[in-house]
Amino acid sequence: DDCTTYCYGVHCCPPAFKCAASPSCKQT
């Protein structure tokens, strides 16, 4: 699993996603 973004220091987001308002990812 490729992680390019870490939301809140722990939640891993894949390359095509960014951090949402909560500790989760949303597609961009």
Curated annotation (Swiss-Prot):
Disulfide bond among keywords: yes
Record key words, sorted: Disulfide bond, Ion channel impairing toxin, Knottin, Neurotoxin, Secreted, Toxin
Domain of life, per lineage: Eukaryota
Cellular compartments annotated: Secreted
Primary location group: secreted
Disulphide bonds in the chain: 3-13, 7-19, 12-25
Tissue: Expressed by the venom duct.
GO CC terms in record: extracellular region
One GO MF term attached to the UniProt entry: ion channel regulator activity
The UniProt record lists the keyword Hydrolase: no
UniProt remark on domains: The presence of a 'disulfide through disulfide knot' structurally defines this protein as a knottin. The cysteine framework is VI/VII (C-C-CC-C-C).
Function: Probable neurotoxin with unknown target. Possibly targets ion channels.
Protein name: Conotoxin Cal6.43b
Organism: Californiconus californicus
